[in-house]
Amino acid sequence: MQFSVGNIYQPSECHTCMDDQTFISTIKTGDKKKIEEMADDLWNYRDLYQRNALMISAMYGRTDLIEFFAARYDHIDDRDIEGNTALMWAVRNNRMESAKSLIALKCSIDIPDSAGNTPICWAVIFGYTDMVKLLISSGANINISNDEGDTPAILASKYGRSECLKMLIEAGCDLNAKNHNAQNVWKAAEAFGRKEILEVLASLSNGR
């Protein structure tokens, strides 16, 4: 399946005296007026990991700045050096309001990082049940697989995220999908000793 992904930023010469610490701290704690005055400098800067102002805003839950930067600059799906989008940073830091704001602004919800993990994959890995619920309700692909062939359901089995698995099952995920090690959800749960996952799977009427 082909994804419409944002550009991975290619660094160019910086024309400001800003550094990573100033860049991040300004977005993290700065007042809105100061940020508006520095808007162009902030947007044109990228940190060591090629993260832009929108990504840092999402990371620290600055929903007000997400809306500000997204309205000013049309790069909502740009990716950093590891392929993370602003939505990915919101998800990985469990910033619900940031994620909701980005989704409302029509960001792409299934852009994978450099390892093939999409936002819902990371939400499952960390066990962020509310985030998983949000992503499912927003149309995330629940059967997408990462570079190891792991679907969100297989990841839930590996990491013992039983509540996440229940949500995925309710949403109609494919329990028979296998990763590159020929593991489906049952085999993954067995391999990682996830008894709680096996109990969830045992409760299914169709069994293995």
UniProtKB/Swiss-Prot annotation:
Cited SUPFAM superfamilies: Ankyrin repeat
UniProt keyword list: ANK repeat, Repeat
Record has Repeat as a keyword: yes
Native species: Thermoplasma acidophilum (strain ATCC 25905 / DSM 1728 / JCM 9062 / NBRC 15155 / AMRC-C165)
Source organism, top-level taxon: Archaea
Protein name: Putative ankyrin repeat protein Ta0196
ANK repeat residues: 49-78, 82-111, 115-144, 148-177
Transmembrane segments: none
